[in-house]
Amino acid sequence: MRAPMLQKQQAPRMDTPPPEERLEKQNEKLNNQEEETEFKELDGLREALANLRGLSEEERSEKAMLRSRIEEQSQLICILKRRSDEALERCQILELLNAELEEKMMQEAEKLKAQGEYSRKLEERFMTLAANHELMLRFKDEYKSENIKLREENEKLRLENSSLFSQALKDEEAKVLQLTVRCEALTGELETLKERCAQDACQAQAREKELLELQSQQACTHTKETEQLRSQLQTLKQQHQQAVEQIAKAEETHSSLSQELQARLQTVTREKEELLQLSIERGKVLQNKQAEICQLEEKLEIANEDRKHALERFEQEAVAVDSNLRVRELQRKVDGIQKAYDELRLQSEAFKKHSLDLLSKERELNGKLRHLSP
């Protein structure tokens, strides 16, 4: 009985792949996406270089400086966008892992419930055997007392009837022999019942030990899974910190670029025609940036909707098993991941707002340059 039960318990674990393999597959997909974005950025740089080759040397030098700065800004924006997408995808992977762990937890709870019912049945059977054993002991004691009384009466009758009833005495002796034979048979049956009770008790203890070992193994697997989730959460926190540092560096570069642009405005009157052409080109670049920002906003809205759907599904599943401590721990972890994601989203929105402010300032400068031109 125990061997097929263990095979049934181990069967679903062999079918489902471990969460580490899924994380490796997701990381490979992310690396492929990063390589594709890098190739696209290189193509854009090549097109920009081809456009610069058709200009004069002075225009190339100045436009190359501005173009390099604008490309650095666009590269930083692309890097930050790619990092935010990676964080979103890893959050989704963790949510999927949490759902799988909850399903495994439900399966393990059902198995433990079945094992508890089986142990309860064994205990009930053991109690019935113990009650039967006590009844047999009482019957044996009563039979011994009756046998002693009969022997005493037999002795009295034998003494009284030794001289009177020899034939009756022989009959009584035959009855006594029959009773002794019956007593011996009953004692043999009692000994066999005792041995059976002892064997059943040993089997029940062995099964209880096996159940306890299975419970300890399942507890070890649950602790390992929680440690893996904690390590993944720590890596996500580190990546979030790196993204925050990169955003701060990008803001510093933006501030330095704005200072350089203000210094450059003092020499604008000497280079009116060239600056008009530059303003037109920069207007095109700004339109491209606005299109990229709109695409980022659409992707962020889609990711938010997917996250809301996943959270609603997770909450519906968590309501059914809210009494379990494991689900509460997972809920706390998901809340921490959600909080980190909200912070990263707020920082990305602040960075987007800052970039929009810089773009509006550049537009104002372009308008002023157009007014200065004849």
Curated annotation (Swiss-Prot):
Compositionally biased region (Basic and acidic residues): 19-32
Species name: Homo sapiens
Keyword annotations from UniProtKB, A to Z: Coiled coil, Cytoplasm, Nucleus, Phosphoprotein
Coiled coil stretches, renumbered: 20-351
Superkingdom, taxonomy of origin: Eukaryota
Keyword Kinase found: no
Post-translational modification Phosphothreonine, affected residues: 16
Cellular component annotations (GO), alphabetically ordered: cytoplasm; nucleus
Protein name, per record: Coiled-coil domain-containing protein 89
Family (UniProt): Belongs to the CCDC89 family.
InterPro entries reported for this sequence: CCDC89-like (IPR043450)
Assembly: Interacts with HEY1.
Annotated region described as Disordered, given as residue ranges: 1-40
Keyword Plastid: no
UniProt-annotated location(s): Cytoplasm; Nucleus
